[in-house]
């Protein structure tokens, strides 16, 4: 592949074409007093077809070019023990300062090749799904133009050969998330969610910018050649002064984009956008960027072991924290949102214990089953006439069988059931934590795996099993399967949820750990111990047993759930009654939003009000108003002497001249 720049350029062209056509068509209809986005006025079929073909086609062609580039590279890398050298293609010089230049250059290596494989594939399937899902929505052209721009930004981020260019893609996905989360701009909650995502990410992006400057200060360059310099220092056992601070700043940026620690709060609210957007953000694009950044800068983090430890603990804490919230959510998309936060915590846990390859492997497998789950939830919502409360669902397995089967496969995959993809990637993370001696982190991850299995099968049980629990409109009774444009992507994603783990089967199970060997040249690992085969198999069986226990527990409580909306499961109701305040706290998402409001937003709002009223209005405005008042008084005094009569001016001139002569004579 000699033109890597074409891969991000194609979605960019799709954005420009779709946006231009949508804008021109909207203006033409506005002249006819109909309006392209007016409720109830559908776009002409030809225009919808154009937007769909351009939107899907541009990303689909990018996927074809991606696989044309990465398949030969991957095959070549597997034949060379040390892997192929990265392919770097310079497009043009972006900035120059003395001898230093920042180029628009694209890099293909094992890490970017792995990212390209699922970003373009999953992105294409989400675009295809959107053709059916968004068919009757307003702003069809605007939607596909934003979606194409999102893909352009993400592909730029993945292929960038320098931190400055990566940051362009980084900010691009942030902008697109704001546009797409707030897609329904006539709804206040969607607008608020878009703002929340944008502002929360600015906190992380501030750290990211400082981290980029820190990298330049340490290594004299922000190109990814600094990774090789860092690798040499790892081998030499030298860590430059300030590397810990730089790692923390880059990690802050990763936390914002990948919703870790307190910066997770924007991600659940991102459900305000269309469901395919949720799938794109949560599965293949934006939220994986933080993990990718940590893996790309792995050599830098290895130089700061304390920073890695912090990454691991933040990831583990976020994983179990978000999993507990997922236990008590009733909105089908909110359950999946907190599941994403939890699974991202798993990925950061892996990176924190030095298993960067395991973290990226889980990014890879997670993209398929999480996209399948989100798109499946969209199919459920479509069938239930936009109902998202699982307490009003039930009995849908027979009415939307394709959606049910694909979501069941994806649920078993995320739960870590053998031989599905999630089993291998999750166990690679847990095994790495154990092998590196982080047994507390291992136990946290193991317990989180059980919670994941429980709340995900709770979702399946409440949605598909039991008797319909719909409202008076009887949506459950009249549910219908989605069109082929929506179900075919579900089946493809479900298939990858089964087979994607094959590239990471460990040697103890007869595999070759192909993904680990493939990524080896692109990431730097600290020393991780080896486990005895018996212990490794024992830990796998233990995690499998925990997952099965979680599934069984969810089935026992929710599998046959029926009855009124207020009491979907008597056992669950009794459990939450027994847990009392703790249960209510979990159901209310640990009151994190309220805590942030009380501890951060409200104090800053009060400080802002004080500065506005006490400083700006009183002091700054006071100075300006006092100046105006003095000028006004001076004007009034001068006006007293300004009569408009020449004789008065002549008298004043004569008296003044006489006074001047007297002063000179007396002196």
Task: Label each region the model flagged.
Residues 1-10, 46-60, 100-118, 156-169, ...:
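Membrane-entry segments of alpha-helical transmembrane domains in multi-pass membrane proteins
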Residues 57-77, 204-214, 410-414, 489-509, ...:
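Hydrophobic alpha-helical membrane-insertion segments
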């Amino acid at each position: 592949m000699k033109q890597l720049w074409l891969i991000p350029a194609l979605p960019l062209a799709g954005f420009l074409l779709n946006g231009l056509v949508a804008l021109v068509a909207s203006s033409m209809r506005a002249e006819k007093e109909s309006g392209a986005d007016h409720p109830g006025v559908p776009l002409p079929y030809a225009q919808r077809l154009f937007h769909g073909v351009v939107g899907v086609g541009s990303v689909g062609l990018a996927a074809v070019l991606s696989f044309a580039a990465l398949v030969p590279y991957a095959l070549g890398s597997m034949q060379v023990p040390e892997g192929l050298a990265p392919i770097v293609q310079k497009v043009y010089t972006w900035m120059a300062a003395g001898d230093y230049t920042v180029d628009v250059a694209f890099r293909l290596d094992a890490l970017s090749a792995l990212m390209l494989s699922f970003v373009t594939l999953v992105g294409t399937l989400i675009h295809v799904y959107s053709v059916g899902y968004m068919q009757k929505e307003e702003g069809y052209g605007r939607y596909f133009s934003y979606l194409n721009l999102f893909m352009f930004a993400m592909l730029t981020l993945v292929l960038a050969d320098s931190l400055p260019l990566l940051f362009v893609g980084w900010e691009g996905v942030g902008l697109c998330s704001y546009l797409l989360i707030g897609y329904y701009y006539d709804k206040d909650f969607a607008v608020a969610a878009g703002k929340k995502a944008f502002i929360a990410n600015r906190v992380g992006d501030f750290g990211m910018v400082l981290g980029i400057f820190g990298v330049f200060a340490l290594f004299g360059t922000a190109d990814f050649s600094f990774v090789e310099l860092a690798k040499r220092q790892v081998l030499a056992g030298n860590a430059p002064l300030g590397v810990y601070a730089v790692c923390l700043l880059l990690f802050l940026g990763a936390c914002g984009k990948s919703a870790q620690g307190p910066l997770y709060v924007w991600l659940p609210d991102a459900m305000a956008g269309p469901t395919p957007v949720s799938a794109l953000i949560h599965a293949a694009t934006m939220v994986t960027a933080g993990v990718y950044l940590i893996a790309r800068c792995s050599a830098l983090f290895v130089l700061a072991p304390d920073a890695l430890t912090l990454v691991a603990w933040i990831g583990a804490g976020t994983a179990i924290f978000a999993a507990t919230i997922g236990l008590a959510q009733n909105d089908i998309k909110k359950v999946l949102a907190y599941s994403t936060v939890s699974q991202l915590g798993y990925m950061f846990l892996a990176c924190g214990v030095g298993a960067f390859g395991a973290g990226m492997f889980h990014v890879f497998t997670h993209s398929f089953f999480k996209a399948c789950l989100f798109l499946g939830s969209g199919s459920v919502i479509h069938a239930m006439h936009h109902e998202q409360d699982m307490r009003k669902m039930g009995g849908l397995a027979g009415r939307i069988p394709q959606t049910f089967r694909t979501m069941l496969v994806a649920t078993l995959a995320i739960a870590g059931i053998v031989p599905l993809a999630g089993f291998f990637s999750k166990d690679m993370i847990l095994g790495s934590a154990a092998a590196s001696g982080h047994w507390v982190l291992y136990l946290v991850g193991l317990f989180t795996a059980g919670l994941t299995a429980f709340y995900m099968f709770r979702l399946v049980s409440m949605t598909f099993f039991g008797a319909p629990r719909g409202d008076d409109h009887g949506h459950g009774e009249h549910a219908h399967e989605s069109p082929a444009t929506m179900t075919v992507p579900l089946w493809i994603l479900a298939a990858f949820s089964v087979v994607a783990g094959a590239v990471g089967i460990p040697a103890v199970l007869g595999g070759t750990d192909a993904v680990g060997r493939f990524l080896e040249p692109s990431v730097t690992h600290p020393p991780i111990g080896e486990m005895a085969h018996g212990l490794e198999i024992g830990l796998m069986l233990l995690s499998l047993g925990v997952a099965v226990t979680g599934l069984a527990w969810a089935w026992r409580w929710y599998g046959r759930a029926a009855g009124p909306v207020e009491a979907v499961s008597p056992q669950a109701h009794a459990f939450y009654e027994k847990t009392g305040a703790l249960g209510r706290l979990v159901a209310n998402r640990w009151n994190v939003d309220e805590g942030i409001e009380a501890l951060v937003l409200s104090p800053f709002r009060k400080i802002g009000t004080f500065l506005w009223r006490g400083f700006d209005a009183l002091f700054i405005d006071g100075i300006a108003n006092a100046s105006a008042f003095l000028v006004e008084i001076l004007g009034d005094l001068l006006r007293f002497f300004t009569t408009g009569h020449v004789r008065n001016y002549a008298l004043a001139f004569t008296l003044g001249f006489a006074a001047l002569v007297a002063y000179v004579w007396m002196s």
